[in-house]
């Protein structure tokens, strides 16, 4: 008996030693493994680092980051919304973080760009560490490990933390997770010193996170939701002492977060001041509820859970009712900015509503199977079951468990709202994936089998889970390497923008479709002011779309009011032309994206490549054939098994027109036009078949209006092309045809000889009337003007009703002749912030009605001018065409832009080349804006949608516009 007892004791000691060794190994090895995976996460995310950024918005963030390094806390960005610039709308905390990171890594030789490329992968590295710490705090070490492993290779997480994507949601989430870990330790810790440290970290990290992203209200709402639920649950279950302890610890910390966060809104480090005020009001409501909970027992029945629950329910319902009455429907629109219902936002993919296909793609392993997401659901069920069991059996509401449940629930709510939140939810999904595996490992560890069997089971489970990173990491790496070769480098944008940078004035402006505005502005590329980009002047998107998608007079936009110099056409925008056509009013909502069942959607433009006698697009399964039958030709478009006949086909060269039936072999309509060139076939929906994009992108001179194509090509002159990018110089006033009166006959000429001429000039005024203008001819040798000849005047010419002008001129001997129109027009770009009475104001809306004061401007010009300074109003609005409401599938929206001068502020201002500082006393008349708004509302009623109202400072000078340059030829006649 004694011997057997001794053996049992020895075996017990041996088991204890094995268990202690196992625990020690786990505590040491798991953190090492996590650190290794975090480094691997950094490696994967840094594979995208190259010359440029794969994400277009990051070009803008890079520019503001450089301004922060240069100026500290800048307020103004001069390159957007040309020629005015814009206030910086993003929180400066987003840029202070990588700027601080640069200060550290610059010690090791990294420059500004290299540090900026390192920053997002470093955020990814931190995110992996943060999820590990949160997982081990919520459940166990295994949870932290497997959450970190999954986050390392999560496509959803990679999508916002790869090098070249420096948006704010990445650093916000990493900081918020660290803050949450600090909060949970703070609430648990009993040691006073450590409690102060954790509490300080909680407040500090949360406040910093508020400055990282304008979506940071998510963090405040998670914390407030957690606090509200914990307060209510502890009260209902009668845990008043725990409630008092929780209130004493959490409430002051949350109040400090709101106070410090709001204080940082004044220097612009945090930009969610309105939401902080709202959160404070909700927090006051929670405090009011708390007071009733703690002190209402004197008057209310708190005898049991049912009565306490009833009291809370009534008060909460009353609170919601009061909040709804105070705030309105937007009470339920948490993060509503992510899914705003405007026509522009409808066309932005990342703001679209999330589908199950998106979830599967972003949370898939090797393919779009959504495995990571679906394995997080058992984690939710496990933790929810554990929480409810502890709550109802032990009256215990664990901070860690409740917080994790609130975090996951609110993350999934946002994931449901918009595609962009697939990233934000990646942390919660990884955490609950880890909870599922961590719980399974915990079950194995607590089994009664010997440690060898348990270890074997644990190893098998671990190997099964390790399949995820081993299988998906190579997929992610291939995607990352593909992203490194950016669209800029392979399409011609790099060469075109560097040409623009080298061959135009530093004050020149350019535009394209808004997606490319940040490339135009970037100091790495164009370094020129852009009229529209991905974050500014969103009202102008409709005007750009109107120009690109339409034809004829309606498409004539007053680009001169934007002081536009260059328009860049990207041939690949045919793939975006559904969105462009919709925003430009060319097609209806149904034609853009289909009805509720997806029916009615059209493809506006499709390209095919010439291959012998046919034109092929293998991806769309389309073949265009030119069929010769006897002496006639017909065009057949094969779509799968269908054969269709377009309404019209036009073959170039020769402008040969071939009419068709506009129907397919099954009798369905086929409302398309086909253009065939030697290398390319263009299939265009009939509503956009003559659009300006078709003209400028493919050089097809098509229009529904006589001579409009010729006019357009005179106003937009190609000056550079590389790959799929064409740079056009914009001329507001141009001559598209010159006729010379020779021997009693008008003859069109392309050259002019020295001597006397009677010329008929066909003028195209694009989007702007000619008023009190003078016509000149400059005779040039090279770039030197040898003679300036006045040839005529134009008192007024409506840009929609141009007519030819007859002039008499005697031309001297010269190499070429430049025709000039001189009339008043805008000049200058703002180079610094606009101040009214010393305060920086919005440069595109500088004064309100009835406001007056000292106006300070900085304006840059290329040469000397004498200018008058005006306040000008610009209204950009849509008028619904068709449909009974704005949500009707048959509705289309026609863009309009109206401009008018409000008042002259000062005349005779001397502007010199370079930057000029101008100070004037300004006064904005009353009712100048409101009266015009009322006029539009009266005219259009509920069909009116105002997209932008501007009050802009404009310098008006006598300005010379080049209309055409013609080469000289040898003298050969005299005019009669």
From Swiss-Prot:
Q: Where, in residue ranges, is this chain on the Cytoplasmic side?
A: 1-21, 134-135, 187-193, 237-247, 291-306, 382-396, 440-453
The record places the motif (TIXE motif) at 347-350
Query: In this UniProt entry, which residues are annotated as the site Important for catalytic activity?
Result: 160
Using the UniProt annotation, give all residue ranges assigned to the region (Interacts with target acceptor peptide in protein substrate).
513-515
- InterPro entries, from UniProt? Oligo_trans_STT3, OST_IS, OST_P1, OST_P2, STT3_N
Where is this protein localized, as stated in its record? Cell membrane
The answer to keyword Repressor applying to this record is no
User: Domain notes, please?
Assistant: Despite low primary sequence conservation between eukaryotic catalytic subunits and bacterial and archaeal single subunit OSTs (ssOST), structural comparison revealed several common motifs at spatially equivalent positions, like the DXD motif 1 on the external loop 1 and the DXD motif 2 on the external loop 2 involved in binding of the metal ion cofactor and the carboxamide group of the acceptor asparagine, the conserved Glu residue of the TIXE/SVSE motif on the external loop 5 involved in catalysis, as well as the WWDYG and the DK/MI motifs in the globular domain that define the binding pocket for the +2 Ser/Thr of the acceptor sequon.
Q: Which organism is it from?
A: Pyrococcus horikoshii (strain ATCC 700860 / DSM 12428 / JCM 9974 / NBRC 100139 / OT-3)
Q: What membrane topology was assigned to this protein in its record?
A: Multi-pass membrane protein
Q: What is this protein called?
A: Dolichyl-phosphooligosaccharide-protein glycotransferase 1
User: Which parts of the sequence bind Mn(2+)?
Assistant: 57, 167, 169
Gene Ontology MF annotations: metal ion binding; oligosaccharyl transferase activity
Q: Where is this motif: DXD motif 1?
A: 55-57
Extracellular side residue ranges read: 43-112, 157-165, 215, 269, 328-360, 418, 475-976
The UniProt entry annotates the motif DXD motif 2 at 167-169
A GO CC term assigned to this protein in UniProt: plasma membrane
Give the binding site residues for a glycophospholipid. 420, 518
Report keywords, A-Z. Cell membrane, Glycosyltransferase, Magnesium, Manganese, Membrane, Metal-binding, Transferase, Transmembrane, Transmembrane helix
Task: Cite the EC number.
Answer: 2.4.99.21
């Amino acid at each position: 008996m004694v011997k057997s007892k001794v053996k049992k004791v020895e075996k017990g000691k041996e088991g204890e030693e094995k268990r202690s060794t196992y625990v020690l190994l786990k505590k040491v090895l798991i953190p090492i493994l996590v650190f290794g995976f975090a480094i691997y996460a950094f490696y994967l995310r840094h594979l995208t680092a190259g010359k440029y950024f794969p994400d277009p918005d990051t070009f803008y963030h890079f520019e503001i980051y450089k301004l922060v390094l240069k100026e500290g806390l800048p307020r103004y960005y001069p390159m957007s919304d040309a020629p005015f610039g814009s206030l910086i709308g993003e929180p400066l905390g987003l840029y202070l973080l990588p700027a601080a990171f640069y200060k550290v890594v610059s010690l090791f030789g990294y420059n500004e760009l290299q540090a900026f490329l390192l920053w997002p992968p470093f955020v990814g590295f931190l995110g992996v560490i943060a999820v590990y710490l949160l997982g081990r705090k919520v459940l166990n070490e295994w949870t932290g490990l497997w959450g970190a492993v999954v986050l390392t290779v999560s496509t959803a997480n990679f999508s916002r933390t790869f090098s070249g994507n420096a948006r704010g949601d990445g650093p916000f989430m990493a900081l918020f997770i660290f803050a949450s870990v600090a909060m949970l330790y703070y609430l648990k810790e009993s040691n006073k010193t450590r409690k102060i440290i954790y509490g300080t970290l909680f407040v500090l990290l949360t406040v910093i996170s508020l400055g990282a992203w304008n979506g940071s209200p998510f963090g405040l709402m998670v914390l407030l939701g957690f606090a509200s639920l914990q307060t209510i649950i502890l009260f209902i279950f009668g845990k008043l002492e725990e409630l008092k302890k929780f209130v004493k610890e959490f409430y002051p910390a949350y109040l400090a977060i709101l106070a410090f966060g709001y204080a940082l809104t004044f220097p612009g480090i945090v930009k969610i001041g309105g939401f902080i005020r709202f959160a404070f009001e909700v927090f006051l409501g929670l405090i009011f509820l708390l007071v009733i909970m703690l002190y209402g027992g004197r008057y209310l029945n708190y005898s049991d859970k049912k009565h306490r629950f009833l009291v809370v329910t009534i008060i909460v319902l009353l609170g919601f009712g009061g909040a709804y009455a105070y705030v309105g429907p937007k009470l339920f629109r948490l993060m509503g900015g992510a899914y705003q219902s405007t026509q522009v936002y409808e066309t932005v993919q990342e703001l679209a509503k999330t589908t199950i296909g998106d979830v599967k793609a972003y949370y898939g392993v090797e393919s779009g199977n959504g495995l990571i997401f679906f394995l997080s659901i058992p984690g939710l069920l496990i933790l929810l079951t554990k929480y409810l069991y502890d709550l109802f059996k032990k009256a215990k509401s664990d901070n860690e468990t409740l917080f994790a449940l609130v975090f996951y629930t609110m993350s999934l709510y946002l994931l449901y709202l918009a595609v962009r939140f697939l990233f934000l939810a990646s942390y919660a999904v990884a955490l609950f994936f880890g909870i599922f595996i961590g719980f399974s490992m915990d079950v194995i560890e607590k089994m009664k089998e010997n440690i060898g069997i348990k270890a074997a089971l644990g190893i098998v489970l671990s190997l099964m889970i390790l399949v995820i990173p081993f299988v998906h990491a190579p997929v992610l790496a291939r995607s990352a390497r593909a992203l490194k070769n950016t669209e800029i480098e392979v399409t011609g944008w790099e060469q075109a923008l560097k040409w623009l940078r080298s061959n135009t004035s530093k004050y020149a402006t350019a535009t394209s479709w808004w997606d490319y505005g940040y490339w135009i502005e970037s100091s790495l590329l164009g370094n020129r002011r852009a009229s529209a980009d991905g974050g500014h002047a969103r009202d102008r998107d409709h005007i750009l779309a109107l120009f690109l998608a339409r034809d004829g007079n309606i498409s004539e936009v007053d680009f001169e009011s934007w002081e536009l110099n260059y328009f860049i056409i990207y041939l690949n925008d045919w793939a975006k032309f559904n969105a462009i056509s919709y925003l430009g009013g060319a097609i209806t909502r149904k034609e853009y994206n289909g009805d509720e069942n997806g029916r009615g959607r059209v493809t506006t433009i499709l390209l095919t490549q010439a291959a012998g006698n046919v034109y092929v697009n293998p991806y769309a399964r389309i073949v265009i054939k030119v069929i010769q039958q006897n002496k006639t030709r017909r065009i057949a478009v094969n779509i799968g098994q269908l054969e269709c006949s377009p309404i019209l086909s036009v073959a170039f060269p020769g402008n040969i027109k071939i009419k068709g039936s506009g129907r397919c072999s099954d009798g369905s309509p086929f409302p398309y036009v086909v253009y065939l060139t030697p290398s390319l076939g263009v299939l265009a929906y009939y509503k956009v078949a003559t659009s300006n994009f078709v003209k400028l992108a493919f050089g097809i001179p098509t229009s529904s209006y006589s001579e409009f194509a010729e006019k357009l090509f005179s106003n937009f002159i190609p000056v550079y092309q590389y790959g799929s990018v064409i740079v056009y110089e914009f001329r507001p006033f141009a001559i598209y045809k010159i006729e010379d009166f020779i021997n009693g006959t008008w003859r069109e000429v392309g050259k002019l000889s020295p001597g006397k001429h009677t010329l008929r000039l066909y003028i195209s005024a694009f989007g702007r009337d000619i008023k009190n203008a003078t016509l000149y001819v400059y005779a040039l040798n090279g770039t030197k003007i040898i003679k300036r000849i006045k040839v005529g005047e134009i008192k007024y010419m409506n840009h929609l009703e141009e007519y030819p002008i007859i002039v008499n001129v005697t031309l001297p001997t010269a190499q070429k002749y430049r025709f000039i129109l001189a009339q008043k027009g805008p000049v200058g770009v703002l180079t610094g912030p606009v101040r009214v009475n010393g305060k920086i104001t919005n440069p595109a809306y500088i004064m309100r009605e009835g406001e007056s004061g000292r106006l300070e401007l900085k304006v840059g010009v290329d040469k000397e001018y004498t200018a008058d300074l005006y306040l000008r109003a610009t209204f950009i609005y849509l008028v619904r065409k068709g449909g009974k409401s704005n949500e009707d599938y048959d509705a289309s929206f026609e863009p309009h832009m109206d401009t008018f001068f409000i008042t002259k502020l000062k005349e005779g201002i001397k502007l010199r080349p370079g930057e000029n500082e101008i100070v004037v006393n300004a006064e904005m008349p009353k009712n100048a804006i409101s009266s015009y708004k009322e006029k539009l509302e009266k005219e259009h009623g509920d069909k009116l949608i105002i997209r932008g109202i501007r009050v802009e400072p404009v310098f008006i000078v006598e300005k010379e516009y080049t209309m055409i340059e013609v080469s000289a030829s040898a003298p050969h006649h005299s005019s009669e």
